[in-house]
From Swiss-Prot:
Protein name: Large ribosomal subunit protein bL36
Signal peptide: none
GO CC annotation: cytoplasm; ribonucleoprotein complex; ribosome
GO MF term list: structural constituent of ribosome
Species, as recorded: Colwellia psychrerythraea (strain 34H / ATCC BAA-681) (Vibrio psychroerythus)
């Protein structure tokens, strides 16, 4: 899980999801998981 100020989709499988006010990127590739913080 990468914690970044700006989260972006890295590949076409990435999805941007908002959970409890936190923006996250989910993907089939574990390296692409991110959250904003």
């Amino acid at each position: 899980m990468k914690v970044r100020a700006s989260v972006k989709k890295i590949c076409r499988n990435c999805k941007v999801v908002k959970r409890k006010g936190v923006i996250r990127v989910l993907c089939v590739e574990p390296k692409h998981k991110q959250r904003q913080g």
